[in-house]
């Protein structure tokens, strides 16, 4: 008796992933380290100076982590309620943070108690940072105002009340010590100059603005809000250069790499997209477990950190590059390895014993082996098979048809099972690789259950959907045939013109070949 041969699942060729230099570069990070914080992480900021520690703002604390440490090396907890947007100064010596109660606190990295406290906002302060002159602080709060503060005197210099909704993001120019930018939920981005009493530029983003970023050159501004990341030319009065829509949910954070050639964006859709700042196309993407609130890249691009809504801090360090001198060469096999067994001469009385390989059969193969056609069809109609590997379902249907038992496997089913079959056929019949088999299945289902049509509203609805799907496919085929007819006419006309042109050249004694003819 011949052994059972498992059902052959036709393999469909897959397109290989395009490997680029960016792909190789961004894959060069180690397995991430997970650090659990006390709450959602709203801000991550790297110190601009070595050893590049980073500040993490979560819940009512600001933790300072060493670059490779998994435990905080310092904690600032002098907040009555939630803390927001802890940011380093350019020299890495001071840290400023906003709070839910509306006050702003300035900390010395070497101490624990706040050096200064700035009071003036009446509601939560979600954005705070240093101007590039190092002696002033800008802030924005839920009271719709943006303020400028003097560090030595701990007083408010000027306050702007131009936004009509919460101010949730901001940044300062690195070239001009008087310029800072704020973004608000009123869909606008405003550019302020400390020397003026009002904003100098207003940009309409179109969605609540979650993050803004100014290029180091000061000429380009990036805003994120809704599903959009937009790039603006500040030197041309806020002209829109490009609008990127590569996320499926709200974009919450932005970041630039050290060279300014790559822009990173994080979103609630759990993705970090990396764009080229020349073509503004996505060159790589990272996937994470939950929604992303904050994102930071170390000054040397050696560490990428993502903060998520569940309070998890995801830290990826770059793999060290191995020098060619230190890399050990693989040991070459000994000579006896190559000549082993070459001098053996088989004898006539030798017995050759072949060990049969163990074949693990799937559930549907076991049922087919025992000729249980109906149960085999039920096995491949399970959700995890019909939804994710429909080629297995179709292959079993094809095998049942080859055996002549497909009709008996389809017969004798209740309303729910018939509806499931029709749903699968309707969804997959338009795929060319499944069409021949599923047309046969559809014909058999129609023949078997035609007498009961009209007795079940659910089955009737599925039959109508199948009819609509087949009708649409027939219309597509007719349109394609029309296009093929047009193309045949064009090719025929082109062939006639070339033949006429060639005859004219021959009659004139020209020796030009058809490959050198002018394009028609």
Swiss-Prot record:
One of its GO terms (biological process) is ribosomal small subunit biogenesis. The keyword Disulfide bond does not apply. It comes from the Eukaryota. Keywords: Nucleus, Repeat, rRNA processing, WD repeat. GO terms for cellular component: nucleolus; small-subunit processome. It is found in: Nucleus, Nucleolus. InterPro entries: U3_snoRNA-assocProt_15_C, WD40/YVTN_repeat-like_dom_sf, WD40_repeat_CS, WD40_repeat_dom_sf, WD40_rpt. WD repeats lie at residues 36-75, 78-117, 120-159, 162-202, 204-242, 246-285, 287-326. CDD domains: WD40. Part of the small subunit (SSU) processome, composed of more than 70 proteins and the RNA chaperone small nucleolar RNA (snoRNA) U3. May be a component of the proposed t-UTP subcomplex of the ribosomal small subunit (SSU) processome. Ribosome biogenesis factor. Involved in nucleolar processing of pre-18S ribosomal RNA. Required for optimal pre-ribosomal RNA transcription by RNA polymerase I. Part of the small subunit (SSU) processome, first precursor of the small eukaryotic ribosomal subunit. During the assembly of the SSU processome in the nucleolus, many ribosome biogenesis factors, an RNA chaperone and ribosomal proteins associate with the nascent pre-rRNA and work in concert to generate RNA folding, modifications, rearrangements and cleavage as well as targeted degradation of pre-ribosomal RNA by the RNA exosome. This is U3 small nucleolar RNA-associated protein 15 homolog.
């Amino acid at each position: 008796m011949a052994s059972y041969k498992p059902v052959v699942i036709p393999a469909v060729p897959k397109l290989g992933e395009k490997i680029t230099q960016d792909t190789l570069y961004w894959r060069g990070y180690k397995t991430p380290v997970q650090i659990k914080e006390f709450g959602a992480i709203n801000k991550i900021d790297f110190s601009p100076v070595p050893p590049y520690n980073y500040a993490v703002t979560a819940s009512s604390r600001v933790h300072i982590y060493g670059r490779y440490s998994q435990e905080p090396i310092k904690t600032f907890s002098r907040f009555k309620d939630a803390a927001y947007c802890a940011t380093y100064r350019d020299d890495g010596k001071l840290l400023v943070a906003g709070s839910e109660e509306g006050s702003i606190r300035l900390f010395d990295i070497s101490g624990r108690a706040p050096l200064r406290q700035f009071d003036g906002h009446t509601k939560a302060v979600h954005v705070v940072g240093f101007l590039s002159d190092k002696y002033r602080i800008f802030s924005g709060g839920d009271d719709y105002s943006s303020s400028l503060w003097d560090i030595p005197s701990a007083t408010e210099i000027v306050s702007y009340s131009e936004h009509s909704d919460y101010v949730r993001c901001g940044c300062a120019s690195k070239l001009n010590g008087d310029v800072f930018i704020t973004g608000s939920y009123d869909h606008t981005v405003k550019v302020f100059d400390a020397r003026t009493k009002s904003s100098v530029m207003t940009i309409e983003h179109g969605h609540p603005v979650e993050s803004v970023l100014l290029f180091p050159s000061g000429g380009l501004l990036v805003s994120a809000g809704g599903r959009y990341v937009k790039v603006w030319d500040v030197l041309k009065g806020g002209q829109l250069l490009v609008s990127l829509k590569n996320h499926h949910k709200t974009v919450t954070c932005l970041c630039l790499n050290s060279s300014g050639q790559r822009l990173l964006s994080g979103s609630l859709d759990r993705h970090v997209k990396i764009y080229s700042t020349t073509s503004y196309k996505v060159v790589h993407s990272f996937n994470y477990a939950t929604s992303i609130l904050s994102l930071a890249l170390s000054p040397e691009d050696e560490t990428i950190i993502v903060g998520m809504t569940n309070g998890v801090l995801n830290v990826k360090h770059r793999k060290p590059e191995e020098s060619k001198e230190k890399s050990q060469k693989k040991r070459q096999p000994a000579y006896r390895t190559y000549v082993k067994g070459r001098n053996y001469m088989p004898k006539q009385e030798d017995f050759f014993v072949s060990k049969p390989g163990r074949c693990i059969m799937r559930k549907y193969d076991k049922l087919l082996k025992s000729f249980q056609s109906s149960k085999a069809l039920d096995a491949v109609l399970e959700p995890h098979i019909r939804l994710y590997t429909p080629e297995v379902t179709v292959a079993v249907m094809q095998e049942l048809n080859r055996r002549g038992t497909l009709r008996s496997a389809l017969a004798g089913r209740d309303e729910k099972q018939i509806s499931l079959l029709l749903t699968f056929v309707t969804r997959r019949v338009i795929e060319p690789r499944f069409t021949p088999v599923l047309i046969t299945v559809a014909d058999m289902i129609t023949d078997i259950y035609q007498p009961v049509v009209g007795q079940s509203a659910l089955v009737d609805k599925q039959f109508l959907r199948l009819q609509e799907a087949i009708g649409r496919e027939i219309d597509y085929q007719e349109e394609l045939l029309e296009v093929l007819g047009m193309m045949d006419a064009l090719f025929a006309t082109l062939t006639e013109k070339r033949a006429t042109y060639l005859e004219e050249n021959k009659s004139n004694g020209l020796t030009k070949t058809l490959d050198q003819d002018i394009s028609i």
